Curated annotation (Swiss-Prot):
This is Outer spore wall assembly protein SHE10. It is found in: Mitochondrion. Keywords: Coiled coil, Mitochondrion, Ribonucleoprotein, Signal, Sporulation. The gene is SHE10. One of its GO terms (cellular component) is mitochondrion.
Length: 673
C-alpha cells in the first residue's frame, strides 16, 4: 500500500503542478507583475503561445481532468497487483537470494580476514620494521618523512575546516531558500484566493478538491525544506480529507442512529437473547483466534529481547576466538621463518647459538617435534574454543525454551480462567433466559434448544483452543536464523582454520626440507674436506714411511759396507801382524824393536775395539728407527679406527634423520587423507 500511495502522490504532484501552472497562466493574462515574467511561458517566448497552447488546451487539460477523476479507480486496480508482486518478489529475495548472498558474503569475509591476518599483516609488519630501520639509518629521509607527515596533518585539518564551513554555508543557503520558497508559495496562494476566479470549469466539488491538492502540493514543498513542520501539514491534510470524503456517510450514520433511537424502545426478548448470544459467540471465537496470536507475539518479543542481549556477547566471543586463532598463526609463522637460521659458537662458553635472518638470537632451536607441538596446540585451541561457543549456545537455547514454556503456561492459565468465567456466566445467563421465556408468552423452546447446542459447541471450541495452545509450536524463526548464522560462522572458522593450518604445515615441511638439504650439503662439504685432509695426511704418512724405509735401507747398506770395510781392514791388520811376527821371529829383536812391536799390538787392539763399538752403535740406531716406525704405524692405525668410528656415527645419524622424515611424511599424508 505504501508503494501505491507513492505512485498516487506522484500523480497528484504532477496534477498539482499542471493546475498551478494553468492558474498562474490565467492570473498573468492581464497582470504585469514580476512573478508573471517567470511563470508565463507565453510572455517569455511567443513560440510557446503559438505552438504549445492550442495542443495544451485540446489534449493536456482533458487528460489532467480524467486522471483526477480516475485516481481512486487506479488505486483500487493497482493496489492488489502491486502488493501481490511486491510480496512475491520479497519472498523470492528472502528465501533464495538473501541466504545465498549472505553465505557467500560470510565466506568471503572470513577468507579475506584469515589470509589478510596470516599473510599480509606479517609481511606488512616486517616491511614496517625494515622501513623504520632504513629511516633511522638515513637522517635526511627521516627528516623529510617527519616534514611530510606534519604537512599531511595540517592539510587534513585544513580540509576538515573547509568542509565544515562549506556545510554550514550550504545549510544556511538551504534554509534561506526554503523560507523564500515558502513565502512565495504563501503569497501565490493568497493572491489566488483573492482573485475569486474559478480554478476550472468543473463543479464545486472538483474545485474543493483542487484546493485540497494545491494545499497538499505546497505543504509537500514546504516539508522538503523544513522537516520540523511536516507533521502539522500532514495532520491538516488528513483532517481535510476525512472531512471531504466522509461527510455524506456521517449524515447517513446520524440519521440511522436517530431512526434506531426511535425504534429500539420496544425490543422483543427473542431478538435480545439472540443478539446477546451472537455477541458472546463472537467474543469466544475472537478470543480463541487472538490467543495464539498473542502467544506468538509475546514469544517474538521474548526472543527479540534475548537476542538483543546475547548477540553482542556471541559476536564479541567470536571476535576473540578469531584473534586467538591469529595469535597461534603468528607463532607458527614466526617459527617457520626461524627454521632458516645460522649456528654460531659462543667464544666464552662454547655453547651453540642460533640466529634468524634478522640477526636475532633464537630462544629455542626450531625442530620438527617443536613444530608439531605448535600445530597440536593450535588444533586443540581451535577445537576447545569452538566447543565452548557451542556449549554456550546450547545453554542459551535451553534458557529461551524454558522461558517460552513459562509464557505458554501463563497464557494457558489466563485462557483457562477466562474460559471458566465466560462459560459459567453465560450458562447462568442462558438458564435465566429459559426461566424468563417459560414465564412469558413467547414460544422460545426451539430457539433455546438451538442456543444450548451452540453453547455446547462453543464450550468445546474453548477446550480445543486450550489444547491447541498447549501444542502450538512457538515461532522461533528469528532464534533459528541466529543459530544458523552462528553455526555457519563456527563451521567457517573451523574450515578456514583447518585449511590455513594445512597450508602452514606444508610451508613448515618445505622449510624443514630446505634446511635439511642445506645441512646435508654442508655435511657433504665437510666430509669432502675431511676426506681430502685424510688423503693428504695419508700421503704425508706414506711419504714419511717411505722416507723412513729409505733411511733404514741406506743405514743397513752403510752398516753392511762399514762391516765389510772393517773386516777387510781387520784381515789386512791381521796379515800385517802375522808377517811382522814371522819377521820378528826370524830376526832377533833389540830393545827398540820390542817397544815398537808392543805399540803396534796396542794400535791393533784399539782399532778392533773401535770397530766393535761402531758396530754396536749401528745396531742401536737401527733398532731406534724400527721403534719409531712401529710407533708411527700404531698412530696411523689409531687414526684410521677413529675415522671408522666417526663414519659409523655419521651413518647412524643420517639413517635416524631419514627415518624421522619418513615418519613425518606418513603423518602428513594420513592427516591429509
Amino acid at each position: 500500500m505504501r508503494r501505491v500511495r507513492g505512485v498516487g502522490n506522484l500523480l497528484v504532484t504532477i496534477l498539482v503542478v499542471l493546475i498551478g501552472f494553468k492558474q498562474a497562466r490565467k492570473y498573468c493574462e492581464s497582470n504585469e507583475a514580476e512573478f508573471c515574467r517567470l511563470t508565463s511561458l507565453s510572455r517569455a517566448s511567443p513560440w510557446w503561445n503559438e505552438h504549445i497552447d492550442p495542443y495544451w488546451d485540446s489534449y493536456v487539460s482533458p487528460c489532467v481532468t480524467k486522471i483526477h477523476d480516475y485516481e481512486h479507480k487506479l488505486d483500487e486496480w493497482a493496489a492488489p497487483r502491486i502488493d501481490r508482486a511486491y510480496y512475491q518478489v520479497q519472498d523470492i529475495v528472502e528465501t533464495k537470494v538473501v541466504p545465498v548472498t549472505y553465505k557467500w558474503y560470510k565466506t568471503v569475509q572470513f577468507k579475506t580476514q584469515v589470509y589478510y591476518n596470516g599473510h599480509f599483516v606479517p609481511f606488512l609488519g616486517h616491511a614496517r620494521i625494515l622501513a623504520k630501520q632504513w629511516l633511522a639509518s638515513e637522517g635526511f629521509f627521516q627528516r623529510l618523512y617527519l616534514h611530510v607527515q606534519q604537512g599531511l596533518f595540517c592539510l587534513r585539518n585544513w580540509s576538515l575546516w573547509v568542509w565544515n564551513g562549506s556545510l554550514e554555508a550550504f545549510n544556511e543557503i538551504h534554509s534561506w531558500s526554503g523560507h523564500a520558497l515558502q513565502e512565495i508559495s504563501n503569497k501565490f496562494s493568497v493572491t489566488e484566493n483573492q482573485s475569486g476566479e474559478p480554478v476550472t470549469d468543473e463543479d464545486p466539488s472538483d474545485t474543493d478538491e483542487s484546493k485540497y491538492y494545491d494545499a497538499e502540493y505546497f505543504e509537500g514543498e514546504q516539508g522538503d525544506y523544513n522537516e520540523d513542520d511536516e507533521t502539522v501539514y500532514l495532520t491538516s491534510t488528513i483532517i481535510e480529507t476525512v472531512t471531504l470524503s466522509d461527510e455524506k456517510q456521517l449524515d447517513k450514520s446520524t440519521s440511522a442512529a436517530n431512526g434506531d433511537d426511535g425504534s429500539s424502545l420496544d425490543v422483543p426478548l427473542r431478538d435480545l437473547v439472540q443478539d446477546e448470544f451472537q455477541a458472546w459467540s463472537n467474543t469466544v471465537e475472537q478470543k480463541a483466534s487472538n490467543t495464539l496470536t498473542q502467544f506468538d507475539s509475546e514469544v517474538e518479543e521474548l526472543v527479540e529481547a534475548k537476542l538483543s542481549k546475547a548477540q553482542p556477547n556471541i559476536t564479541g566471543l567470536l571476535q576473540g576466538i578469531s584473534e586467538s586463532f591469529q595469535s597461534h598463526y603468528r607463532i607458527i609463522n614466526r617459527a617457520i621463518l626461524d627454521v632458516d637460521c645460522t649456528m654460531e659458537l659462543d667464544p666464552e662458553t662454547g655453547e651453540q647459538l642460533y640466529f634468524n635472518k634478522d640477526g636475532t638470537q633464537l630462544r629455542k632451536y626450531v625442530t620438527r617435534p617443536l613444530m608439531r607441538e605448535f600445530f597440536s596446540s593450535a588444533h586443540a585451541h581451535v577445537d576447545e574454543r569452538l566447543e565452548m561457543v557451542r556449549a554456550r549456545l546450547e545453554k542459551f537455547v535451553a534458557a529461551v525454551n524454558k522461558e517460552v514454556e513459562q509464557v505458554r503456561q501463563e497464557h494457558l492459565e489466563v485462557y483457562e480462567e477466562w474460559g471458566d468465567v465466560m462459560v459459567s456466566e453465560w450458562s447462568k445467563r442462558m438458564a435465566y433466559v429459559d426461566v424468563v421465556a417459560a414465564m412469558g408468552a413467547e414460544d422460545m423452546n426451539q430457539q433455546q434448544h438451538d442456543n444450548w447446542k451452540r453453547f455446547l459447541k462453543l464450550k468445546k471450541q474453548v477446550v480445543n483452543t486450550r489444547d491447541l495452545l498447549m501444542q502450538h509450536p512457538a515461532k522461533l524463526e528469528r532464534l533459528q536464523k541466529f543459530l544458523n548464522d552462528i553455526q555457519f560462522t563456527l563451521m567457517a572458522l573451523q574450515r578456514d582454520a583447518g585449511e590455513y593450518l594445512f597450508i602452514l604445515r606444508s610451508q613448515a615441511n618445505i622449510a624443514f626440507q630446505t634446511r635439511e638439504k642445506l645441512e646435508r650439503e654442508r655435511e657433504e662439504e665437510e666430509r669432502r674436506k675431511l676426506e681430502q685432509e685424510r688423503q693428504i695426511q695419508e700421503q704425508k704418512e706414506r711419504e714419511q714411511q717411505e722416507l723412513a724405509e729409505n733411511e733404514a735401507r741406506a743405514a743397513r747398506e752403510r752398516l753392511a759396507l762399514e762391516q765389510g770395510q772393517g773386516q777387510e781392514q781387520l784381515e789386512q791388520n791381521s796379515d800385517e801382524a802375522f808377517f811382522s811376527m814371522e819377521d820378528i821371529t826370524a830376526t832377533p829383536l833389540g830393545a827398540d824393536d820390542n817397544t815398537d812391536y808392543e805399540n803396534a799390538l796396542d794400535d791393533a787392539d784399539s782399532q778392533l775395539s773401535e770397530s766393535g763399538d761402531s758396530e754396536d752403535n749401528f745396531y742401536d740406531s737401527y733398532e731406534g728407527d724400527e721403534e719409531d716406525a712401529s710407533r708411527e704405524l700404531e698412530r696411523l692405525e689409531r687414526e684410521s679406527a677413529e675415522r671408522e668410528t666417526l663414519d659409523r656415527l655419521e651413518l647412524g645419524q643420517r639413517q635416524k634423520l631419514q627415518e624421522e622424515q619418513h615418519r613425518d611424511e606418513l603423518h602428513h599424508s594420513s592427516q591429509a587423507n
